[in-house]
UniProtKB/Swiss-Prot annotation:
Recorded coiled-coil stretches: 393-527
GO molecular function: ATP binding; ATP hydrolysis activity
UniProt binding sites for ATP 2: 610-617
Lineage: Bacteria, Pseudomonadati, Spirochaetota, Spirochaetia, Leptospirales
InterPro entries, A to Z: AAA+_ATPase (IPR003593), ATPase_AAA_core (IPR003959), Chaperonin_ClpB (IPR017730), Clp_ATPase_C (IPR019489), Clp_N_dom_sf (IPR036628), Clp_R_dom (IPR004176), ClpA/B (IPR001270), ClpA/B_CS1 (IPR018368)
Region listing for NBD2, in residue ranges: 560-768
Gene: clpB
Name of the molecule in the record: Chaperone protein ClpB
Linker: annotated span: 343-550
Domain Clp R: 3-148
Amino acid sequence: MKLDKLTSKLNEAIYNAQASAEKLGNPEISEEHILKEVLSQPDGLVPLLISKLNLSPKSFLESTENALGKQPKVGGNTSADVGFSRSAVSLLKAADEVRKELKDEYLSTDHILLGLMKNGTGSLKTEFLKLGLEYHKLLKITLENRKGKTIMDDSPEGKTDALAKYAKNLNELAKQGKLDPVIGRDEEIRRTIQVLSRRTKNNPVLIGEPGVGKTAIVEGLANKIVQGEVPEGIKNKTLYTLDLGSMIAGAKYRGEFEDRLKALLDEVKSSDGEVILFIDEIHTLVGAGATEGALDASNMLKPMLARGELRCIGATTLKEYQKYIEKDAALERRFQPVYVKEPSVEETVTILRGLKGRYELHHGIRILDSALIAAATLSNRYISDRFLPDKAVDLIDEASSKMRIEIDSMPEELDRANKRIQSLKIEREALKKEQDTASKERLKTLERDLSEQEQNFQTLKARWDLEKSKIGRLKQIKEEIEKYKNLEAEAERRGEINRVAEIRYGKLVDLQKELESANEELKKQESASRLLKEEVSEEDIANIVSRWTGIPVSKMLQGERAKLLLMEDVLKTKVIGQDHALRLVSEAVQRSRAGIADPNRPIGTFLFLGPTGVGKTETAKALAEFLFDDVNAMTRIDMSEYMEAHSVARLIGAPPGYVGYDEGGQLTEAVRRRPYSLILFDEIEKANPEVFNIFLQILDEGRLTDGKGRNVDFKNTVIILTSNIGSEILGSSEYTSEEKERLVEQRLKKHFKPEFLNRIDEVILFHSITDSVIHKIADIQLEGLRQKAKENGLDVSFTNELKDYVSKAGFDAEYGARPLKRLIQREVGNALSRYILDGKFTNGQNVTVDYRQGKVVVVV
């Protein structure tokens, strides 16, 4: 007997057997050591064969370990002289005899077990016979497993039963009810069946955007095959999905991956068309396993695909199909494309209705139909970079998950009561140490209060536990219904009519009644007194959308409505003297939040015109602060940086092949990260005219395609463009208001193209600041300075004389409010800073800033 032709698994087992003998202190490697290692190989042949005989590999392993425990042991270092025992040599000889009979080249682990059961003489064979293992049955299952092949190399394990190892049986999953129902994809499933039924090139490839339901179509086909709702051509066929990850994992040596793939393909081929192979992300096969001089996986598939020996369904996205499969013309012609389009909102609602039961069962909650409609419509409108129905299903799943967590967590009311009790207990312990009368009186009052609070807490807790148990019971009944529906479908497939009738008209009817009564019981509790909510509503979906995108799509609360109605007044406190401009901006935002604006355009597009320093940029800042509670929550793009025609690439991202392609554009990336935002394009007349072309689609369609070809959604942005065009006309006192408007309009038409001006919602003229409003502006600027001083521990007030002085000295009709800001900064700011630096003040001190004898002074 030669020991040079052992399979890698048997080599590994013998090596481990030697290590095991040394560890246990046994003087020799016995047949028990070898069999223990052979039986404990998780992906070995022996456990697989025993399982196929409907026996437990675990019981055989335990029996072997018991026999090992009775082996003699020696003390000291045994590693030097551990050799094979007589029983081990006999076992290997018996295995070699079996190998010769089966005409195998290599000695494998299955030969070891066959050799033991055929020619073994020890107690282990007797034990195995008691456990039900017989030689002729073992030989029969071994030959069946090999499918007429002999062992010609050292890794047969990777090639036997390759389908079971490297693919998942979708038919089995469908029978067990583990696949989600597939709704509204009949046309695509029919087209797939049509291609599969061809004589040659019967390989459909499903092409569609990520998340449109390509894999779901194959799962739908598996369901239809199991239910027998398919043409004769593919009736009783078995659908397997290839697990490329497990095929590549552990393929250490060159050619091992190809061996495994070849074995799997041969198994599919030998099934005579009974197996249909589904390869998800089929583009991963192109280049898989292609090391130096080796074929890649796709080239191994080509001959079988062309001859019709392999029926295969592929699935990939359009981008990857173009990148990998279209490049390889020979591979492309062997596949027949089936395009899977994104479903409409109405179709998505139908799909969600079909899936609703599964999600209700998993999370143990109820999903209202209005929530399904909201998930489809809101995801379509606000989540633009993903596809239906995937994004709508995700919304339902996350809202349900949030609801489940809330049911399992302590309700807010109960949590508050618990914290109050803890606080009172701490106070009680502190009062017990006090001896005065007031403390003793307070302790008595506190004891009564604590007793009431604890009683209230126990009542609330009992209510919570009761509601939880009722919701839990609902989940339990639904699980029972699902289980019996699967049993009914299985019985129907087997033709057990009596069993079907027993389940359908007996058990399911009873469970349905039980479910209705449990629902009624839960509804009896007043909704106002309920601690737990177990229904996912439209509002819950809207909250999840808001959390994902930052866009406020949930129903407006009373406080927000009042805030929006007062929007104009709030803005007037920040920007003085531009009431007309503020009214137009407020109206646009109110229209959008009330839901009556055009949903396919930005919230509002405004062109602010006027001389410098009149409040154009300040209005944008005030609006950002009002909408987002943060003055910095706006994307400001200074158009003076875009004077060259090529600088448009900085806004939308460099095209492929240029430096900076991966970085994206300043504008598009800002909006992708924050879809609900304010974008300020400052001083647009300074930009190159070419740059305005990108504004056309933003202002009209509310979208822009960036350098990577992605659509960026501007529908939830407020766009403000500022310009100084015609500022000398608006600042002049020579013209009337009507003349100013007409002259500025003429200037605009000269500078901007008609298609650009036509897309702007409102052109808002900011008029020069008059001396009547300069006092109010001075008040705002001084208040800002007062706040800064307060942060440094100084409480400042300003006299009317000072206010009169800065208003007169800082007013300049030509330059607006900026000279006033500079004057306050220079004179009042300097006076305060000198006072602080002199160290004359104490923290929290009150000082007054006055104007006396032509000087700004600080008075304590």
